[in-house]
Amino acid sequence: MKDISIDTLKQRAEILRAIRKFFDERDFIEVETAVRISAPAPEEHIDCPPMKNGGFLRASPELQMKKLLALGMERIYQIGPCFREGEKGLRHNPEFTMIEWYRRDEDYRKIMQDMTDLMSRIMPDAEEDKLAKIVQVREAYREFAGWDPWEQWDQDRFDFDMATKIEPAIKQMGGGVFLTDYPLAAASLARARGDVAERWEYYWNGMELANCFTELCDREEQLGRFEKARAARKALNEADYPIDMEFIDSLPLIGSAAGVALGVDRLVMVALAKHDIAAVREVE
């Protein structure tokens, strides 16, 4: 705590109040779901801390929140702690605060508008045309990396070029940038539309803040993606996570939806012009 000032703690609290007010004004319901879960979503390179007596600390409340959508909730948000093993640095901490929000019967374009409006609220001095530049993933790779991931998929090259070429180029653009429409191989939990996944990530001055999907609600396709992710984790000698079949079985009840995960600590960092996560929250 020694790196955090009282003024910063007060400003962080004001930002959290502003976030809640923003969603309350739009008739969202704030929800709470379990922090200790039995079955995380299997994703390569995202490791949830295991608990001694079984289960895991969540990396995201995503699966649990989607179950609420399946029950009939329409607009929900949650602010709370999340955990990822092995992530520590100026922008990372094993424990961090996340906000996720979801809308039934909407797609990623509506969440993009939410994100733009929220940033306008949190960054009131930012020029409007600096809040929401849209960059297509395919065009970004063609221009800044010199190849097309759709023509010849290479996961390692895609990830390497994202970190060394695409994100530095986004930083040079300044302000808010939506990097949108990913290859299907990088769809994660996003719905496909033709040869693209309806997914975007939002950056502010080059720092990734948020990751959004039009949600995949096809039971069999999602089960297949989870099985493929489990196989990839096994090949990398990473921990195996059981599949949450309650989540899988709930997907047809959702119909259609979109949602986003936004890192609160990073949002506070950019709002207060801090360059170290330790300046805005307690860290290990």
Residue ranges and their predicted role:
Residues 1-7, 144-145:
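A short, surface-exposed helix-loop junction/capping segment
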Residues 11-15:
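Aromatic- and glycine-enriched glycan-recognition loops and surfaces
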Residues 18-21, 34-71, 75-104, 145-284:
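A translation/RNA-centric and nucleic-acid-associated enzymatic feature enriched
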Residues 30-32:
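Short beta-strand elements
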Residues 91-153:
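A conserved active-site cap/scaffold subdomain adjacent to cofactor or substrate pockets
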